[in-house]
Design a protein with these regions (language model features):
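Glycoside hydrolase catalytic-domain context in secreted enzymes
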Residues: 1-622, 634-646
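Short beta-strand elements
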Residues: 647-659
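Short beta-alpha junctions and helix-cap segments that line functional grooves
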Residues: 625-627
Length: 659
């Protein structure tokens, strides 16, 4: 068992980046490669995928998540599990491993974005927003589920019988292995929920937890607990059966060294050219172009100064690349030099990655931050002199990989102070600035966006990230990524997400100067960059939308076909992600302003008009009603089509009626 979250040795972009590709075929292929490389090293189980919905980028583990949207979480769960486990209903085939969906449940919604903090939400929100990703994993026949560290409405997830038995086992019909997160059984005591190890073991076993990860609570206590207790013995027998069934499904009784004996240096696929090719494709499609004032793509002959602590940094794999090796990384400098030639553009570090005070807060990771022998002011002075002699400046900035990930919650999600000082110095030169951001979360980029001519969100892009970025900078690849999570303008907007409820006093343009509306007096309600947003080197025009019918009936298997025409009006061929949102105008519970229901990533040549069709069924219109039943309700629905959650130029309406 190991955390193979986004690659074994072939490290792909972090999961939050992967979902910005909106290419779930490619995400599945990456998971399949991860499984194959893991299989060759004798690993049988990975603790992936994580499908926790996250609306607060202060939380460090957002880097492992699919973002803020439920549909994206459902698709991510399904396709990653298919890539890891294959299509077999029971037996895990050769070159595949068992997946483990996590963290059950709602771990991605800690109060104030603080790691391991309590989660407090209504059951309605839990079911409508947070649980569908886990259910999708169960439907995909995931072999394991991992409990969460957090309390959910006052009850720690690992000891929560309602959550794990009644919902996961009885309602979702999950029959596989339930494993605790690291030491979570023992932490039932720390939570104040269990009065000692014996009660912790009892509570976890009653909640149908099968494996106690990394503590000896089960080992020390279960013998006494089941002695002369028929009910507890029955629970233990069921747990043992589920674990043995998993081993059987993996073929470990026939071959305990599954995968290892087939491996040799000659036939190993680890870091092979095909795997790197997939990593490059996924990196290119995950990168999001956030701003471009015509400065991109670059001409090869234009002299550009590449400045910043990430200009030649290999540690760009993200914190949870457990088996990854930074020496496999192609840096930004490597990628640019491969295209334009060595020594054609000047490079320099420009600033420290983070300040000493922040490094001290990283705990055991402090020693992984390089010792600085040159002052930040001296580095900035060198960078300014380099920039003065160049036509354009490329700034490679971002947070340290150790500032995100587990235990990486932050209250200020801006650029580290040394880098902000560098940015401030460069912007005074009035040079064209292309800013590249490496991060494991959406950062507050309001000032950076204002003073950059182009802005690229690279995330932590994996081993091929430098080549992918260079290909985008020089137009070899046309960016197509779109955000799977909103970028706030300021930390005070958090949590921020596109599918919010309307409120009784919405912030409408016609009420711009009306005080008593749902708005801030010192900040816009809108994010800096919205869910689904991302630019291309070409432009697209949404020409028309039509429906094949205006009425569909309940319980009739009616299908409503939405047809849209999209034209590539720019100078480049490209991929556009056409997005379909639905608004339920009225419901027995208040409905979001819009919800993503479908999308298609479509290749459109310059000058071409593409016709794209979507199918809407009654199933997509179902909601959790006030009594928590899941059903559709007759009424009016609006369909919106466009390029992001904020750019939806096409609208149609239809009605769902009773049979």
């Amino acid at each position: 068992m190991a955390d193979i979250i986004y690659g074994f040795r072939t490290i792909f972009p972090i999961p939050l980046a992967q979902t910005c590709s909106w290419n779930f075929d490619l995400i599945e292929e990456a998971a399949s490669i991860s499984a194959k490389e893991s299989y060759e090293e004798g690993l049988h189980v990975t603790f992936s995928p994580m499908v926790d919905i996250v609306r607060d980028p202060r939380w460090g583990r957002v880097m492992e998540s699919p973002g803020e949207d439920t549909l994206m979480a459902e698709l991510f769960a399904e396709r990653v599990i298919k890539g890891l486990q294959g299509n077999s209903e029971q037996k895990i085939p050769k070159n595949k491993i068992a997946g483990c969906v996590k963290h059950f449940a709602a771990y991605g919604a800690p109060i104030a974005g603080r790691e391991y903090n309590a989660v407090d939400m209504s059951e309605h929100t839990l079911r409508e927003v947070y649980l569908p990703g886990y259910l999708s994993a169960v439907k995909a026949k995931v072999k394991l589920v991992m409990t969460a560290f957090n309390t959910l409405n006052g009850v720690p997830s690992t000891g929560n019988e309602w959550l794990n038995k009644m919902i996961l086992r009885d309602e979702f019909k999950f029959a596989g292995v339930l494993i605790s997160d690291y030491a979570a059984v023992e932490e039932l005591i720390t939570h104040g929920y269990a009065n000692g190890p014996k009660e912790a073991a009892q509570l976890a076993l009653k909640a149908t937890v099968d494996i106690d990860m990394k503590t000896s609570v089960f080992a020390n206590e279960l013998g006494a607990i089941v002695n002369n207790n028929e009910q507890m013995m029955d629970l233990l027998n069921k747990a043992v059966y589920r674990i043995l069934s998993l081993k059987n499904d993996l073929g470990l009784f026939e071959d305990p060294y599954r995968g290892l004996k087939e491996r040799s240096a000659e036939n190993s696929s680890i870091l092979c050219s095909e795997h790197k090719k997939t990593a490059l494709m996924l990196s290119e499609e995950s990168i999001v172009l956030l701003k471009n004032n015509g400065v991109l793509p670059l001409e090869k002959g234009k002299k550009a100064a590449i400045i910043g602590p990430y200009h030649d940094e290999k540690s760009t794999l993200g914190m949870w690349a457990i088996k990854g090796d930074i020496n496999d990384t192609i840096t930004l400098k490597d990628g640019i030099n491969e295209i334009v030639g060595n020594n054609k553009n000047p490079f320099c570090r420009g600033s420290h990655l983070i300040e000493k005070e922040t490094a001290h807060l990283l705990g055991k990771f402090e020693d992984k931050i390089p010792n600085e022998r040159i002052s930040n002011d001296e580095l900035i002075e060198e960078a300014v002199n380099l920039a003065k002699d160049s036509e354009i400046v490329i700034l490679a900035l971002g947070e340290s990989i150790f500032q995100s990930g587990e235990g990486g919650s932050r209250t200020e999600i801006t650029l580290p102070k040394p880098q902000q000082k560098l940015f401030d110095a460069i912007k005074k030169l009035n040079k064209q600035i292309i800013t590249i951001i490496y991060s494991g979360r959406p950062l507050i980029l309001t000032d950076v966006e204002k003073h950059s001519d182009a802005l690229i969100q690279a995330w932590f892009p994996g081993i091929m990230g430098g080549k992918a970025l260079a290909n985008i900078l020089y137009g070899i690849s046309n960016p197509s990524g779109k955000l799977s999570m909103s970028f706030p303008r300021s930390v005070g907007q958090i949590p921020i997400y596109y599918n919010e409820l309307n409120t009784g006093r919405p912030d409408l343009p016609e009420n711009a100067f009306y005080r008593f509306a749902s708005r801030y007096i010192d900040e816009s309600n809108k994010p800096l960059f919205s869910f689904g947003y991302g630019l291309s080197y070409t432009t697209y025009q949404y020409n028309s939308v039509s429906l094949n019918k205006k009425l569909i009936r309940q319980n009739s298997h009616d299908e409503l076909i939405v047809t849209v025409e999209v034209e590539n009006t720019g100078d480049y061929d490209g991929y556009e992600i056409v997005q379909l949102y639905i608004r339920d105008q009225f419901g027995s519970t208040a409905r979001p302003v819009k919800v993503l229901k479908d999308f298609k990533k479509v290749f459109i040549r310059k000058g071409e008009v593409k016709t794209i069709s979507f199918t809407i069924t009654e199933e997509q219109l179902k909601i959790y009603q006030s009594d928590l039943s899941f059903a559709s309700e007759p009424g009016q629905f609006d369909v919106y089509i466009g390029s992001s959650s904020e750019d939806l130029p096409l609208k149609e309406s239809f009605e769902l009626i009773q049979s």
